[in-house]
Amino acid sequence: KGSASRTPTRRAAAAAANRSTSDFSGCFTAMAMLSAFELFGLPEKFAIDLDQLEKAHERAILKVHPDRFAGRPAAERRVAEQWSARINESFDVLRDPVKRASLLCETAGHPVDAETNTRMPADFLMEQMAWREDLDGAKDESAREAVRDKARAKFAECESKLESAIDAEKDWTKAVDLTRRLMFIGRFLEQTSAKSSPML
């Protein structure tokens, strides 16, 4: 569901969401109709500008900052809190490549279903087992970091393939498989080092 297919109702919702925060009539309903991408004015694609996302988040969250609603009616403060929660939730989804890819797959009608479908190709699982064995056998932190570097390289490779599968090919079967691989590798990095992050 790209921005090109946005209906008049969704265009009206986008316009309402960009009005002054003093206009609360129907604003939360309008916001609820927007996708995470539309909320920040970004194209619905995997390859997004993270700096642009960061700046859009800062602008959006400033509009609902508690200081702007000091002394305002309780109803307005509650709406501002709802806006803030939705803005932060959408930001967390879009800045995480796994969550972003999962959202795009689901929007296209191809949910990743990571919680219910845990089957992965044997060669992929063997690679993960080899990484863990190498970590267990590593004699120093330098050797362990070398293993994590392999995982980070594989994570970056999956990200690149996802960009092609989603943004260029629209191959959702491939995109779902790559998203699940990205999820497994990211989990490996999180589990093996508190300082390691697939986002880096």
Residue ranges and their predicted role:
Residues 1-3:
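Low-complexity, intrinsically disordered Ser/Thr/Pro- and acidic-rich segments
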Residues 5-7:
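Intrinsic low-complexity, disordered N-terminal segments enriched in polar/charged/small residues
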